[in-house]
């Protein structure tokens, strides 16, 4: 920060104005705490559109986004929404950001995007709302509220920064680096957390990778928190003061 201390950083992607250089990362986040990365995305990969690695780094699941039925978000020009941010406010030190996207199609995640045609896509009527609540050095909360015309499966993906690893428990997920515990992930649902941990997966699809230089992929931990239904809410807290913060639920 300006005083030379370890910085806090949160970015929220709330725009889609052009197909150019666009990944399937609507309402995705990047997160640093105490000057060190916590959440990142898979990065950039060489412009070899048919290559599996390139398809992966552009995908929804390669970002800290909500994946729907294993599909990617549409990047067709007809689906450009401009600015999806409903509000971004600060009350005291606490930041509130909310975005909403109305989706009419989902795109297969295994086809190079320059070869995707309209008939490959999944028609849908989905209203997707994401609320982020951030109190620096204390906690980060992500709440996804999804309404669909039919039952669907939803996965909140969190891709960890290099050097950060996860340990899954029944009620929480511990994130740590080589020196210390960084934070604890807790579900805001009343039922046990329904999460999977992936690192360097190749089959049935790439997951748990990032590219440090645009030419290779390296392994990293990737966490998927799942729910299903027509109307689902997934609430997740990154608790940075895990020894002090009381447990809460939606």
Model-derived regions, located:
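CBM-like, beta-strand-rich accessory domains located in the C-terminal region of large
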Residues: 49-250
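Glycine-rich nucleotide phosphate-binding loop and flanking beta-alpha elements
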Residues: 18, 46, 74
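Catalytic Cys-His active-site segments of thiol-dependent hydrolases/isopeptidases
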Residues: 39-44
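Catalytic-core segments of enzymes that bind and process phosphorylated/nucleotide-bearing substrates
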Residues: 32, 45, 69
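Glycine-rich, phosphate-binding/catalytic loops in enzymes
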Residues: 28, 47-49
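Carbohydrate-active enzyme catalytic cores, enriched for enzymes
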Residues: 1-38, 90-92, 228-229
């Amino acid at each position: 920060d300006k005083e030379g201390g370890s910085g806090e950083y949160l970015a929220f992607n709330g725009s889609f104005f052009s197909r150019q250089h666009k990944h399937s990362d609507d309402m995705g986040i990047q997160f640093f705490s105490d000057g060190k990365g916590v959440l990142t995305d898979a990065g950039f990969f060489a412009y070899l559109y048919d290559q599996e690695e390139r398809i992966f780094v552009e995908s929804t699941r390669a970002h800290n986004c909500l994946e729907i039925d294993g599909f990617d978000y549409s990047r067709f020009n007809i689906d450009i929404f401009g600015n999806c941010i409903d509000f971004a406010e600060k009350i005291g030190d606490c930041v509130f950001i909310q975005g909403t996207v109305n989706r009419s199609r989902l795109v297969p995640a295994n086809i190079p995007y320059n070869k995707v045609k309209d008939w490959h896509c999944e028609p849908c009527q989905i209203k997707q709302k994401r609320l982020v609540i951030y109190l620096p050095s204390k906690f980060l909360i992500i709440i996804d509220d999804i309404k669909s015309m039919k039952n669907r499966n939803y996965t909140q993906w969190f891709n960890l920064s290099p050097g950060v690893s996860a340990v899954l428990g029944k009620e929480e997920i511990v994130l740590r680096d080589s020196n210390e515990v960084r934070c604890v992930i807790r579900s805001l649902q009343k039922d046990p957390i329904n999460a999977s941990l992936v690192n360097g997966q190749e089959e049935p699809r790439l997951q748990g990778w990032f590219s440090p230089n645009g030419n290779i992929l390296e392994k990293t931990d990737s966490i998927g928190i799942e729910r299903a239904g027509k109307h689902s809410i997934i609430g997740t807290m990154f608790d940075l003061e895990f020894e002090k913060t009381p447990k809460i639920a939606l």
